[in-house]
Amino acid sequence: EFRRVLFRSYAMKDNPDFSMLVGPEEIMAESVLLGAHGGVNGGANMFPELYVSLYNAAKNADMEEVRRLQEKVMQISATIYTVGQHGSSYLKGLKCALSLLGICSDYVAAPFHKFEQRERGKIWKALQNLGVDVVLR
């Protein structure tokens, strides 16, 4: 799947009538380096500056900066999006983190349920490890 996304990014990069946006933020920089136009990245709701900087570094082919910023994106992915045991862990982790940051509620529509206090504590710890000062609510 990853190779298909990258191939399409490269194949469509010069087509002015087509925009290629990737969803998985873990591959946004690589896709932009190959011609994609950007990403639809959930983590940008938490850390907009990080994702804009990563996009700009990829657009400018600043590989040192891409590597530095990509490490942070991968840390977010590995710590916030993996709490829980179900496929919904990405969404629930994101919503929980946004709630802890005071951005929005951690409400998720049925059939999902928001994280319990134990999982919220793990998200809080992940945010602390990312250097974010948050109050556990």
Predicted segments, located by residue:
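Short, small-residue-biased leader/transition segments that mark boundaries at the very start
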Residues: E1-L6
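Hydrophobic alpha-helical
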Residues: F7, V22, E30
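Short beta-strand/loop segments at the ligand-binding rim of alpha/beta enzyme cores
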Residues: A11-L21
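Structured C-terminal cap/extension of enzyme domains
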Residues: D14, E26-R137
